[in-house]
């Protein structure tokens, strides 16, 4: 499974499961699950709200990581297949 592979890669670098990379990875998994759920259940407004909240949390973590360590940020978005956000 991709999650186990990614966890092993991160745990080799750091033993901290609360790292920004791991949190972004778990939020990305939740986002993908909610997106597939919402494709079937279009009128599930509570799930839509939850998805927007998780997207905001992930965005804040990614912007923090981009400010602190640009190299780790680039590696992470490359591994997860996330587009780079536009800076305001």
From Swiss-Prot:
* UniProt GO cellular component terms: chloroplast; ribonucleoprotein complex; ribosome
One Pfam family from the UniProt entry? Ribosomal_S15
Please state where this protein is localized. Plastid, Chloroplast
Superkingdom field: Eukaryota
* GO function term, MF aspect, one: structural constituent of ribosome
Which UniProt key words apply to this protein? Chloroplast, Plastid, Ribonucleoprotein, Ribosomal protein
Give GO terms for biological process. Answer: translation
Which SUPFAM superfamilies does the record match to this protein? S15/NS1 RNA-binding domain (SSF47060)
Family the UniProt entry places it in: Belongs to the universal ribosomal protein uS15 family.
Its assembly, as annotated, is: Part of the 30S ribosomal subunit.
Q: Which PANTHER family match?
A: RIBOSOMAL PROTEIN S15, BACTERIAL AND ORGANELLAR, SMALL RIBOSOMAL SUBUNIT PROTEIN US15M
* Name listed for the protein in its UniProt record: Small ribosomal subunit protein uS15c
